[in-house]
């Protein structure tokens, strides 16, 4: 880390982290919606992008390459002693979460997806209580209750709201729930690696993405999705440019998140990422005409209020066993 310290003056590090996370994931969100919910072609022969496995495969390849570069230049002294099977097991939930999240966009609009993915404290807390036997402070439960109330308001539709896109009821939300659960399992696995093997963030990023690349590579070959995607890309070559940018912004964003956690801690990182998600929803409403009702705005504010309070007051935990 000494090399990276000398590159950025202390007074500029926080603004750099904030802008890095905000810009990378803001553009990442725009690209994700453009790729997965855009219409390709003209007239009655319009097509949609349905290649979630291939999209995540390319994203994991770029993440792995980026992590390898970071290790080569900034983290050569660290020796990684983490068990290989742990990386392999973690990659299963990691891949499942990303594929489910991207697939959900075929059934729900982007604000719903972002809000759903913002509810990560819920499965993390449930898995912490059930698997790791953690005890959380009352503030944590109240914050999660606020998030649940916000999601309930956002999802509740007493009548059809004009301008809000209809989708297959329930399936997109189930995919988001699956993604959240798998995110929670990934978090538990990563905590275990850090606690028992002191795994560095760059090595974790490299190895989990390498294993994910193997799993997804087998998946896109076995299902034949790779050939369908190549045919789609031949008809609409701009998709390649968008996907490469999507993967690059994801990798850069991850590196800025790790930098924020290392230098300023998880609280600052939570505040930055929560702020970014709110403005991503706002941008989606403005840029992609995803109107949401006043009740849904109230639900959105409650969710982000709960996330902000959780970042500030809900972090204390006591482990009763491991």
Swiss-Prot record:
Keywords assigned by UniProt, alphabetized: Antiport, Endoplasmic reticulum, Membrane, Transmembrane, Transmembrane helix, Transport
Reactions listed under catalytic activity: ADP(in) + ATP(out) = ADP(out) + ATP(in); UDP(out) + ATP(in) = UDP(in) + ATP(out); UTP(out) + ATP(in) = UTP(in) + ATP(out); dATP(out) + ATP(in) = dATP(in) + ATP(out)
Subcellular location: Endoplasmic reticulum membrane
Domain of life: Eukaryota
Nucleotide-binding recorded as keyword: no
InterPro entries, sorted: SCL35B1-4/HUT1
Written domain comment of the UniProt record: The di-lysine motif confers endoplasmic reticulum localization for type I membrane proteins.
Protein name from the UniProt record: Solute carrier family 35 member B1
Gene, per the UniProt record: Slc35b1
